Amino acid sequence: MSMDGLPPLRDVIERHGLFARKALGQNFLLDLNLTRRIARTAGGLDNATVLEVGPGPGGLTRALLMEGARRVVAIERDERCIAALEEIAAHYPGRLEIVAGDAMKADFAALAGNSGDVKIVANLPYNIGTELLIRWLTPQTWPPFYESMTLMFQREVAERIVAKPGSSHYGRLGVLAGWRTEARIAFDVPPQAFTPPPKVISSVVKIVPRADPLTVEVGRLARTTEAAFGQRRKMLRQSLRSVGGEALLEKAGIDGTRRAETLSVEEFVRLAREI
């Protein structure tokens, strides 16, 4: 038995035939010490509702419950994993809700319900992680329904999330994250911690919404960053032609010979406001 009184994860995986599926972007994290570290990074779980995407056999799910999460809502697309998750639910009566379905189609705010303290904590499937994050960063209304996000990504994606102007990693994702949130890399996780081991290092990122971000319409900022970084090697007067080009830059007071990676979040907001 493991420290939580449940069978070791390797036994659970073998018993239920849960080999990871590449098509679903699965890499199972088996080390309960690491999953508990993720849960502790999220912090303040005692009165929280936690939304978890892609729990798989439930390693992180177990850690969240061990660390005191009042309620965990686990969204799992892989039907093979449901039985393993139901065993965890039986061990923690009334605290784990399993949602069998596609996270890309989920209404996360509705799943959270009227809970005051909502946290998103997940070892996100690699093939949908970035798309989900952008959705969580760009709702029309702000502050969002969640208090924080503690998410695992490939290291390269994590670096893009926290990147600052002038960095080779700085791009659309860094602007969207920097606009409305404070994001930091909490720690790295080596490939050997997973089964099967991925080819890259993973990183856990802690993201906390800003209470009062700069005001701009979401769609305008999205179009501006998409155009600017779609041709990041070109000067802004060329890359931004589709959204206003020289006239837009002049209204925003930004030199058209600059490149996208040199602009601060505040400057991107200025541009977007003028579209």
Curated annotation (Swiss-Prot):
It is found in: Cytoplasm. Its EC number is 2.1.1.182. PROSITE patterns: RRNA_A_DIMETH, SAM_RNA_A_N6_MT. It catalyses: adenosine(1518)/adenosine(1519) in 16S rRNA + 4 S-adenosyl-L-methionine = N(6)-dimethyladenosine(1518)/N(6)-dimethyladenosine(1519) in 16S rRNA + 4 S-adenosyl-L-homocysteine + 4 H(+). GO terms for molecular function: 16S rRNA (adenine(1518)-N(6)/adenine(1519)-N(6))-dimethyltransferase activity; RNA binding. It is an enzyme of class 2 (transferase). One of its GO terms (cellular component) is cytosol. Keywords: Cytoplasm, Methyltransferase, RNA-binding, rRNA processing, S-adenosyl-L-methionine, Transferase. NCBIfam families: ksgA. Specifically dimethylates two adjacent adenosines (A1518 and A1519) in the loop of a conserved hairpin near the 3'-end of 16S rRNA in the 30S particle. May play a critical role in biogenesis of 30S subunits. HAMAP family: 16SrRNA_methyltr_A. Belongs to the class I-like SAM-binding methyltransferase superfamily. rRNA adenine N(6)-methyltransferase family. RsmA subfamily. This is Ribosomal RNA small subunit methyltransferase A. It comes from Chelativorans sp. (strain BNC1). The gene is rsmA.
